[in-house]
Design a protein with these regions (language model features):
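Bacterial N-terminal signal peptides that target proteins for export
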Residues: 1-11
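Cleavable N-terminal signal peptides
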Residues: 13-14, 25
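Boundary at the C-terminal end of the N-terminal hydrophobic targeting segment
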Residues: 20, 25-29
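Acidic/polar, glycine-enriched structural segments that form the non-catalytic walls/loops
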Residues: 28-63, 130, 489, 540, ...
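Aromatic-lined, polymer-binding surfaces characteristic
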Residues: 32, 38-41, 48, 52-55, ...
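Carbohydrate-active enzyme catalytic cores, enriched for enzymes
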Residues: 179, 222-398, 605-615, 629-678
Length: 678
């Protein structure tokens, strides 16, 4: 094997590789045990016919979509192809082929468009309806496939970004398996796909996806299902195991994905994923079904693992996809032969060190309290400037992500939505600080937040090797501690490097979660100068009610009590209505509404400026009918801060991260560094 640049392969008819960047490529395509007969992408005809008998109800819904119902192109073509293969229905196959021929007769897609979906669904029709294609039609598809590959050598090259997987590669790989032996270039292109994944994408998944979370955030729900669809095709066709190339990600992804769902079953029997960066899923969409399908594939794959048996039990609480024309996903991926684990007794928190995510719940019932905390590094475009940010949910969001994703690089996006001001973390205002253009949008606002000092305007890095080379730029945070003791959970993060060193010495955040609903949040913040104002920011779903140090947020059936214990004598400001998106004398309203978002920004600042400040808050999530909790009590000394809340007594150190907790007569240390993000 020799190291070459894949971009140069387009010029060679023998390979015609689809990618750009270094990868190992054999001079001759490797010998693969791909079946020569069709269908093969989803197994043999006999396998599909057996599935139709085993999953008869789901299959009949597929038949209805294939023959009667209106549907999007993807669902329609996949359903038609499945029924054609299972029932050997030539007429239906020819209808599907006619749709494909129309799709591939147009201009060759290129650039940041999801051409993988076109390739993927057309390839599925090619394979499952293979005997009904004429030789000339097959050649026409080969030409379309090869020209699409060649046109997109330099498209979607960043492997921390959803586009590499969902817009590009899954479709190319699927088309290669469908046309193997018949398209002279398919074998070499498929080798390029595998080697690109092995040498660039897998290391990225291991780095930014260790523990099953993903640094890009919510966008994982937009691409993971399609990528797993391709991984299953590879496994079925020739035994290639893409999962084994990135085990730190794949073996934990289903569990992390389960924790990424808010409690409660909502629109059309779906579960809403938590907001992480761009996206956010505030209103119902097909991404919810994609998330379920991805968990189903992984639960079936790792069926002998007890944790995945619990995931299967969780999946079965929403046994049917919400979108009716997605019946083919139920048919293909709902595997009821997996043993159901005991969901109620499963762990109630999960740490994903790659992206620096901690997820926690009070229980596994639908009325549980849900908590999310992020303190991780920079990888790609759809991340926000949100290190130290957290979410709290009970019967609905209580504190969330501010702003609206009204477009990529809009004035609202780059001055509010992705900025620190729209998140539940700390801001330090230096009057002279400026931000470069972000996402090709003009950043005019000084929100006092985290920096955006990366070479690419998106803040993106191409792959793990480039990230490691530029680690001093992209390694901006550390998850210092994570421990769950049942009644309480403790996390600690160092957020310091996410800010300009010209204004901040350090910012550490420690959170003790006392189940079921109390959160003690202690922040140590040291500015470079005493005159730099510090602000503790909270994005409230509804305008808080109260005064002084005690406030209440009520959203539907949920309520959050907020107690500010430090600094003493704080100033509290609320920004809502026309003032919500205004700061620094400018207003940055969104161009469109993306669904229910925080309606008020709460800002807490010390009454007196100082170089070092300590912020201490107690947040208690309850039912809306619950009365106020007992007031927490705080005492401060030269070296420590002591707080009594309920039955717990907690101590935090002032000079460094760490402390102790005493609960039910048992004293335990709060670790200063029990786990790290790398």
């Amino acid at each position: 094997m020799r190291l070459i640049r894949l971009a140069t392969l387009v010029a060679t008819a023998a390979v015609g590789a689809a990618f750009c960047g270094p990868a190992l490529v054999r001079a001759q395509p490797r010998c693969r045990a791909v079946p020569k007969e069709h269908p093969r992408l989803l197994g043999s005809r006999e396998r599909l016919q057996k599935l139709a008998r085993q999953r008869a109800k789901a299959y009949q819904r597929v038949v209805s979509v294939a023959r009667k119902r209106k549907a999007d192109d993807h669902s329609k073509l996949v359903s038609m192809a499945l029924v054609c293969a299972i029932e050997e229905d030539r007429a239906l196959g020819r209808q599907a082929i006619a749709k494909v021929l129309k799709a591939i007769a147009g201009p060759i897609p290129r650039g940041h468009v999801p051409f993988a979906h076109t390739l993927g669904r057309c390839a599925i029709v090619y394979d499952l309806c293979h005997e009904h294609w004429t030789a000339a039609e097959r050649k026409q598809f080969h030409t379309f496939m090869n020209r699409t590959v060649d046109a997109n050598v330099r498209s979607e090259t960043h492997v921390f970004h959803n586009g590499w997987y969902g817009y590009k590669t899954w479709g190319i790989g699927t088309a290669c398996y469908a046309t193997y032996y018949e398209n002279p270039r398919a074998a070499a292109i498929l080798d390029a796909v595998e080697n690109e994944f092995r040498t660039r994408a897998a290391p990225a998944l291991e780095l930014a996806g260790a523990g099953g979370g993903w640094g890009e955030g919510y966008y994982i729900h937009y691409w993971l299902y399609e990528w797993l669809f391709f991984c299953e095709i590879a496994r079925l066709c020739d035994g290639t195991d893409y999962y084994a190339m990135a085990p730190k990600f794949f073996r934990s992804r289903a569990v992390a994905g389960m924790f990424e769902m808010y409690p409660g079953i909502s629109t059309y029997g779906s579960r809403r994923p938590i907001p992480m960066g761009d996206g956010g899923g505030r209103v119902f969409g097909g991404d919810r079904d994609k998330a379920l399908a991805a968990r189903r594939i992984l639960a079936s794959l790792y069926r002998d693992d007890p944790a995945h048996q619990v995931v299967h039990a969780f999946n079965e609480t929403t046994p049917r996809f919400s979108v009716g024309v997605y019946a083919y996903k139920d048919f293909l991926w709902r595997d009821t032969t997996v043993k159901r684990g005991d969901l109620a007794s499963f762990k109630r928190s999960h740490f994903s060190p790659g992206p620096g995510y901690v997820y926690a719940r009070s229980a596994w019932d639908e009325s549980a309290t849900h908590f999310f905390f992020t303190c991780g590094d920079r990888f790609t475009a759809h991340q926000h400037l949100d290190v130290g940010h957290f979410l709290i949910y009970r019967h609905g969001e209580l504190v969330g992500d501010g702003g609206h994703y009204d477009g990529f690089g809009t004035p609202h996006d780059v001055n509010y939505h992705l900025r620190t001001i729209a998140h539940n973390t700390i801001r330090v205002y230096a009057p002279s600080e400026t931000w470069p253009n972000i996402r090709a949008g003009r950043a005019t606002g000084n929100d006092g937040g985290q920096h955006h000092n990366w070479p690419h305007h998106n803040g993106a890095v191409t792959d793990a090797a480039t990230w490691t080379k530029g680690r001093r730029l992209y390694d901006i945070a550390d998850m210092l501690a994570f421990e769950d003791h049942g009644d309480w959970l403790y996390v600690a993060g160092d957020c310091s490097r996410a800010y300009s060193p010209k204004k901040l010495d350090y910012f550490t955040r420690q959170i003790v979660y006392l189940r079921p609903g109390t959160f003690v949040i202690f922040d140590r913040v040291a500015a470079r100068r005493a005159d730099l104002k510090k602000t503790w920011t909270l994005q409230a779903m509804k305008r808080p009610q109260g005064k002084g140090a005690m406030w209440t947020i009520t959203n539907g059936k949920g309520r959050l009590f907020i107690q500010t214990l430090l600094p003493a004598g704080v100033g509290v400001k609320l920004f809502s209505g026309d003032e919500l998106y205004r700061y620094g004398g400018r207003n940055y309203p969104p161009r469109r509404n993306t669904g229910p978002a925080p309606e008020c920004r709460m800002e807490v600042s010390p009454a007196r400026l100082a170089k070092v400040d300590y912020f201490l808050h107690v947040l208690t999530a309850t039912d809306a009918s619950a009365g106020a909790p007992d007031e927490a009590r705080v005492t401060t000394g030269d070296a420590e801060v002591h707080i009594a809340v309920g039955k717990a007594k907690i101590t935090f150190g002032k000079a460094a991260v760490g402390g102790s907790i005493t609960l039910n007569g048992k004293r335990q240390r709060l670790a200063a560094r029990a786990g790290t993000s790398r």
